[in-house]
Amino acid sequence: MPHTSLQVVRIPKALWDELVAHAREEAPNECCGYVRVKYGTAEQVVRAVNERQSPYGYELDPKSLFAANELDDEGYEVGIYHSHPRSPAEPSQTDINLAGYPHWTYLIVSLQNGNEPVVRGWRIADGRVDEEPVVIGD
């Protein structure tokens, strides 16, 4: 699939809080899930089970991945999220290598700075990584 244009991802504060809460609850392991997005604005955060149960990687459980694909088929934009408990909100080489959905946004929640979590968005396609601006607020 061709590399699609980048967009701004708007995350209402309540959903941002939910992403951060999930990351904190699962630490020291990475958390993961997906976000239903419409017209560039996140509408719902859906937690998934990290099949890897690891601080160094994630894998969405099959049921969640199937549900995210169904949203895509229904015309929603999809964001996959995961956390980096001890590193920046930037894709690791493993994240890049395993990114299998070039038209989805990859959101990374970093807890590296303790009380100042960071959420950043990325488009990853064919090894190319481009940041998608994330705007927090209603």
Feature-to-residue mapping (PLM):
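Conserved beta-strand-loop surface patch within small alpha/beta domains used
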Residues: 1-77, 86-138
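Conserved, mostly hydrophobic/aromatic
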Residues: 80
